Amino acid sequence: MLKISATKKRLFGFIILGWVLLLISDRIGELRQYQGAFVAMYTLAIASIILLTGYSGQLSLGHSALMAVGAYAGALSVNNFKLHPVIALIMAALIAGVFGLLLGYAAARLSGPYLAGTTLALAVSLPTIANQFPVLGGEQGLAFDIGLPPARLGEDFSQYQWFFWISCSSALIMIWFLANLLNSRYGREFRALRDNPTAAQLAGINIGRQKALAFSLSAGIAGLSGGLLVMLISGVSPSAFPLSLSFLLLAGAVVTGVYSLKGVIIGALVLVAIPEIAESVVSRIGGSEGFTTSLPGFMVSSLLILAVLFTPNGPGHFLHKKKHLKH
């Protein structure tokens, strides 16, 4: 019997998923297309945290800053260098990846709360840094317009469907790449680094290099998600990447399960669905302005507690374990 390698199985699976998304995009409204694009963006952002924290054991509290690096890189690529928006998204990932590589080497000797504090300081200082350089647009930020969809896609092909295609294609390609990477030698070295750095070093693994590599890859994926975010909101400014975004992404990673990519889309769906659910609850039962503002945060916090109590390794691991118990 012909055996298919795990890499080919993943490729076939992602191709089928891409085909399903392509079919779905013609059958859903513009609102769902827009929300689907946000799900794809959050999927990438959460995956970048899972790579850094869950696989290499490095805790970042400032991933919103890495997203901002990619966002500004993408906007500058379009506005100043007149690059095609899709090329600008690639530049967003590359420049954020280089920034992450430099940061990774600088923080290679840091771990635990020291590394978390460093990334937190970066996220806190982002608005001040952005406001110091006129080329970044100050508080007003920069516009980011990807233009109209290609004419060959037809007159009925909307801007929101174009957003959906770009975001989902980016997420599928990057998650496929990441899944293959984490099942390769690099993934094994990342896990060794996470579980026991001393033993990993004795086994011949270059700790500093692998930490920097993980940071660079994570930053590149976060930068791409930042580029997708500013594409969806048509501009980039410091206010688009608050510190609260970093904590929201961490919550999404915990709901997903930080040690696996299997349920990453679940965490992304949760982050997109909660504001809509909260709005629906408020419209039904009413409430003060403070209640309306705090309800989404309360719902995320409650879900976070439930996830830690009942699915600490994520829903993907839970379903996988349940499937094996049946057999």
Show the residue positions of the predicted features:
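Transmembrane alpha-helices and adjacent helix-loop boundaries
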Residues: 1-327
